[in-house]
Amino acid sequence: MQAYNTQTGIVCPLDRSNVDTDQIIPKQFLKSIKRTGFGVNLFDDWRYLDEGFPGQDNSKRPINPDFVLNKPRYQGATILLARDNFGCGSSREHAPWALSEYGFRTVIAPSFADIFYNNCFKNGMLPIVLTEAQVDDLFEQCLANEGYELTADLERQVVVTPDGTEYPFEVDEFRKHCLLNGLDDIGLTLQQSEAIKAYEAKMQQNTPWIFKEVRA
C-alpha cells in the first residue's frame, strides 16, 4: 500500500449529502474482486447520460456536462470535498477502490459511514472529518476560486488552505501509523513474519501429526 504523509491537490466539491456506495460505484460493476478497473465507473449514474454496464467503451459514452467531475476546472482533482454521511449504504470495499483509482487520496466531509471510513484507511486513503461550518467554508472557497487547492498533512493532522488557515482533524494513532508507513492488513502481518515462522516451527515440534500429509 502506498504511504500517505502530505498531499496537496485540486479540490473537487461534491455538494450532496448521504452519498451511498451504490452511487459511488453502482452494483453492476462489482463482479470483480480485483482492486483495479473501477475508476472509469466512479459515480457512473451521475457521470454519464446513458446506462452503464461492465465491459463497455467508456470513451464513447455521452458524459453529463453538469456533473462536477466532468467540469474542466476540476480535472486532475485528488481531494474530494463532500457532505455529511458520505459512503453510507452497503459495505462494498469497491467504493474506496473506485475513488482511489480515479485519483482521490483524500476525502473531506462532516461525517462518514463507519464501514466506508474504515475501508478508506485499509486502501491508502485518508478520510478527514471537519465541522460542518469548516466544510461550508471550504465549499465556498472552492466554488469561488478555480484550481482551488488544499494540503492535507497527516503527520501534523491539519488541513491547510491557500491563505495558510489550518483546520485540525482527529485520527486514530494506529490508523495514522499504518497510513504513514503504507501498511495494510497484509503489510502488518508480514511485520510479524519471524514470529510466525518461530510459532510454526514450535508447532511442528510439539504437534507433528498436524503437519503430516493426509492421503485419501
UniProtKB/Swiss-Prot annotation:
User: Is the keyword Metal-binding assigned to this protein?
Assistant: no
Q: Which GO terms describe its cellular component?
A: 3-isopropylmalate dehydratase complex
CDD domains named among the record's database cross-references: IPMI_Swivel (cd01577)
What are the recorded Gene Ontology BP terms? L-leucine biosynthetic process
Catalytic reactions of this protein: (2R,3S)-3-isopropylmalate = (2S)-2-isopropylmalate
- Key words, A-Z: Amino-acid biosynthesis, Branched-chain amino acid biosynthesis, Leucine biosynthesis, Lyase
What Pfam families would the database entry show?
A: Aconitase_C
Q: In which pathway does it act?
A: Amino-acid biosynthesis; L-leucine biosynthesis; L-leucine from 3-methyl-2-oxobutanoate: step 2/4
Q: Name one GO molecular function term.
A: 3-isopropylmalate dehydratase activity
Enzyme Commission code: 4.2.1.33
Q: What class of enzyme is it?
A: lyase
Outline what the protein does.
Catalyzes the isomerization between 2-isopropylmalate and 3-isopropylmalate, via the formation of 2-isopropylmaleate.
Say which family it is in: Belongs to the LeuD family. LeuD type 1 subfamily.
What is annotated about its quaternary structure and interactions?
Heterodimer of LeuC and LeuD.
HAMAP family according to UniProt: LeuD_type1
Protein name as catalogued: 3-isopropylmalate dehydratase small subunit
Q: What is the lineage of its organism?
A: Bacteria, Pseudomonadati, Pseudomonadota, Gammaproteobacteria, Moraxellales
